[in-house]
Amino acid sequence: MSKSKCSVGPMSSVVAPAKEPNAVGPREVELILVKEQNGVQLTNSTLINPPQTPVEVQERETWSKKIDFLLSVIGFAVDLANVWRFPYLCYKNGGGAFLVPYLLFMVIAGMPLFYMELALGQFNREGAAGVWKICPVLKGVGFTVILISFYVGFFYNVIIAWALHYFFSSFTMDLPWIHCNNTWNSPNCSDAHSSNSSDGLGLNDTFGTTPAAEYFERGVLHLHQSRGIDDLGPPRWQLTACLVLVIVLLYFSLWKGVKTSGKVVWITATMPYVVLTALLLRGVTLPGAMDGIRAYLSVDFYRLCEASVWIDAATQVCFSLGVGFGVLIAFSSYNKFTNNCYRDAIITTSINSLTSFSSGFVVFSFLGYMAQKHNVPIRDVATDGPGLIFIIYPEAIATLPLSSAWAAVFFLMLLTLGIDSAMGGMESVITGLVDEFQLLHRHRELFTLGIVLATFLLSLFCVTNGGIYVFTLLDHFAAGTSILFGVLIEAIGVAWFYGVQQFSDDIKQMTGQRPNLYWRLCWKLVSPCFLLYVVVVSIVTFRPPHYGAYIFPDWANALGWIIATSSMAMVPIYATYKFCSLPGSFREKLAYAITPEKDRQLVDRGEVRQFTLRHWLLV
C-alpha cells in the first residue's frame, strides 16, 4: 500500500515499525498506518500476503487529550478502598513492614499486569472481548471480566448513594448523627456529646450504640426493620432517590463515550486529592493525631514471618490496581496507537500506591484523635470497610468546629472517588459489548441507557431494609476469586498462547521500543505464578460471608457461588463453542482456536507457531 493512496486531506500520518519475522514460517511484515483527523484515528493494516477480503479502514474515537486518559485511569484505580482498606492492612500487618511485601508484589506482578492490559487494549483497539482475536479460544475471558464489572455495578453504586445521602444530610446546623433524640434511635443509644466520660469499652463495642452507628444502620439502612436476607422489605425512598441521581450522573458522564467521561474526570479524579490534603492538615492538629500516625508507621519486621501478611499484600495489589475488570483495556483502546503505554503504566501505578500510603496519614490522624477522645487503644478504633467512612469518620468530623462544612466536603470526596470508579466499570461493559456487536455500536447511547437502567433495577435490592445483606453477599462473591481467575487466564493467554515475543513486538510497533527482559520474564513466569498463588490462597482461606453477628443461610451462600461461577464459566463455555464451530480435524480446530486471527493464513499453510516448542520457551 502506498502512502499517497491513503492520504486524505490535511491528515497527519505515522508509519509504525514493521514487525519482526515470526519464529516459524515465512517472513511476515505488517504495515500499520495511523492517521488522525479531528481527534479520530484511522488504522489500516495489510500483509505482504493480503487477505482475501478487502482491508477495511476502522474508525475509532480517541481521547481529546492525553491527560483525559491518565485522569480516567487514576480515577478508576484510586477508589474508596484506597481510603478504607490499605491503611488498615498496613497497620494490622506490622505498619511500615507491610510495605516490603506490598511493594515487592507491586513491582513483580502489579505493574507488569497493569502494563500488559494497557498495551493489549491500545494495540488491538477493542474492548475486553475483542482483544482476544490474539487467541480466539480464550475470548470467554473477555466476557468473564465484562460480566464481573456488570455485577460490581449492582452494589458499588449503592456505596455512592450512601455517600450522596450523607452529603445531603450534612447541610444542617446539627448533624443528624451526633444526638440520640431522633426517631430512628434505640433506647440503647448513648450520646457521646452528653458526657465527657468513657465507659471504658472498646469502640468496636461502643459504636454499636453511638449516634453515628445508629444513624448508619437505623437511620440510613433501616436494618432494624429486617430479620435477614430473606426479609428485605421495600426499597427505601431516600436511598432510591440518591441511587437515581447516581445513575443519572453516570449516564450523562458516559453517553458520548470518552469525549464526555474524559471531561468529568477532571473534577472526580482531582477533587479527592484536594480534600485529602485539607483533611490531613486538619487531622494532624487534633489531639492524639500523632499517636495514630505513630501506630500507622510503627515497624514490626517479625510480622513478615507470618503468611497472612504476605497474603494480604498479594490480594491488596491485585484488587487495588483494578486489573482484570476490563477497564484498563477499554480505556487504553481509545489511545493513539503510538502512545507510550509503558510510561503511563509506571505513572499511574506509582500514583495509586502513593495515594494509598498517604491516605493512611489522614485516616490514622483521625483514628488517633478518636482513640484519645474515648480513652481506648488505637486497635479498638482501627477498622476497615464501610464502618470506617460511614461511622467512625462521621463521628470524628462531628466533633470539629464547622462540622457541617467538613462533613459535606468529606462525603463529596467519597462521591467523586466512587463516581469515576463506577464510570470505569460501566465503560468496560459498554465498550466490551459495543465493540463486539455492531448493532449495539450503532446505538451506543441507547445501549448505555439500557446498561445503567439494568444496574439501577438490580441495585434496588441493596437499598431495601435488608439491603446491606444483599450488598455484603455481592461484595463477597461477585469479584473475589472470580476476578483473580480471570486475570490468571488473561496472563496465561497473553504470555503463553499469544507469546511474549509476539506481544513485545506489538509494543515495539506502538512505542518504538521493545520491553526489556525484566518485563518479559514477569509476564511469562512471575505474574502467572503470583496469580496462581493468590487464586489458590483465596480458595483455601475462603470463609462464608457474615454481617456482624448475622450468618447467611445456606441458600444465600449457594446463590453467591452461582454468581461467582457464572462469570468464570464464560471461559470454558466459549472455548467449547469456539472449538466446535471451527472447521476441520481436531488438530486443525485446535490450530485455528489458539492462533491469532491475523495469522489464519499460516494455519491454512500448516505453519502453526503454537505447535512448536520454540514458541513456548521463548522469552
Swiss-Prot record:
Activity regulation note: Inhibited by amphetamine, bupropion, cocaine and ritalin. Inhibited by zinc ions.
InterPro entries in the cross-refs: Na/ntran_symport, Na/ntran_symport_dopamine, SNS_sf
Listed GO biological process terms: adenohypophysis development; cognition; dopamine biosynthetic process; dopamine catabolic process; dopamine transport; dopamine uptake; hyaloid vascular plexus regression; lactation
Disulfide cysteine pairs (residue numbers): 180-189
Biological role: Mediates sodium- and chloride-dependent transport of dopamine. Also mediates sodium- and chloride-dependent transport of norepinephrine (also known as noradrenaline). Regulator of light-dependent retinal hyaloid vessel regression, downstream of OPN5 signaling.
Organism, as annotated: Mus musculus (Mouse)
Binding residues for chloride: 316, 320, 356
Annotated residues for binding of Na(+) 1: 75, 78-79, 417, 420-421
Transferase is among the record's keywords: no
Family designation: Belongs to the sodium:neurotransmitter symporter (SNF) (TC 2.A.22) family. SLC6A3 subfamily.
Tissue expression pattern: Found in the substantia nigra and ventral tegmental dopamine neurons, in fibers of the medial forebrain bundle ascending into the striatum, and within dense fiber networks and varicosities in the dorsal and ventral striatum (at protein level). Lower expression in the cortex (at protein level). Absent from the corpus callosum. Expressed throughout the retina at postnatal day 8.
Annotated protein name in UniProt: Sodium-dependent dopamine transporter
Chain sites annotated for binding Na(+) 2: 77, 79, 82, 320, 352
Molecular functions per Gene Ontology: amine binding; dopamine binding; dopamine:sodium symporter activity; heterocyclic compound binding; metal ion binding; monoamine transmembrane transporter activity; neurotransmitter transmembrane transporter activity; norepinephrine:sodium symporter activity
Location of this chain's protein in the cell: Cell membrane; Cell projection, Neuron projection; Cell projection, Axon
The entry's keywords: Cell membrane, Cell projection, Disulfide bond, Glycoprotein, Membrane, Metal-binding, Neurotransmitter transport, Sodium, Symport, Transmembrane, Transmembrane helix, Transport
This protein's GO CC annotations: axon; axon terminus; cell surface; dopaminergic synapse; flotillin complex; neuronal cell body; postsynaptic membrane; presynaptic membrane
